[in-house]
From Swiss-Prot:
UniProt gene name: RPL35AC
Source species: Arabidopsis thaliana (Mouse-ear cress)
Organism placement in taxonomy: Eukaryota, Viridiplantae, Streptophyta, Embryophyta, Tracheophyta
InterPro entries: Ribosomal_eL33, Ribosomal_eL33_CS, Ribosomal_eL33_sf, Transl_B-barrel_sf
Name assigned to this protein: Large ribosomal subunit protein eL33y
UniProt cross-references to SUPFAM superfamilies, sorted A to Z: Translation proteins (SSF50447)
Keywords: Ribonucleoprotein, Ribosomal protein
HAMAP family assigned to the protein according to its UniProt record, in alphabetical order: Ribosomal_eL33
PROSITE patterns tied to this protein: RIBOSOMAL_L35AE
This protein's record includes keyword Glycosyltransferase: no
Length: 112
């Protein structure tokens, strides 16, 4: 018999929002995405997240490996501007439907 969970649930990631692709006035560069991490508002705070892994999790119609959920992994590469936005590169370019959706920014690999 399994006992109920004791205490509060612990989240091992920070939520982020996908803002869009890196772009100039007339071109966009879909191999780099812009992500706003919750609670990060300055360029100095972004430095802790450099190199951290992130995952865009989405639901698909057909099952693969017994699950409808799939994941695109990425990595925080550098800050973008002064307001806490980061640039991230993903293993494959994010689909356009991902704009405005959530991403999980994990606390590893640690660089302490």
């Amino acid at each position: 018999m399994v006992k109920g969970r004791q205490g509060e649930r612990v989240r091992l990631y920070v939520r982020g929002t996908i803002l869009g692709y890196k772009r100039s006035k007339s071109n966009q560069y879909p191999n780099t995405s812009l992500v706003q991490i919750e609670g990060v508002n300055t360029q100095e705070e972004v430095n802790w997240y450099k190199g951290k892994r992130m995952a865009y999790i989405y639901k698909a119609k057909t099952k693969k490996n017994g699950s409808h959920y799939r994941c695109i992994w990425g990595k925080v590469t550098r800050p973008h501007g002064n307001s806490g936005v980061v640039r991230a590169k993903f293993t494959s370019n994010l689909p356009p439907k991902s704009m405005g959706s959530r991403v999980r920014v994990f606390m590893y690999p640690s660089n302490i």
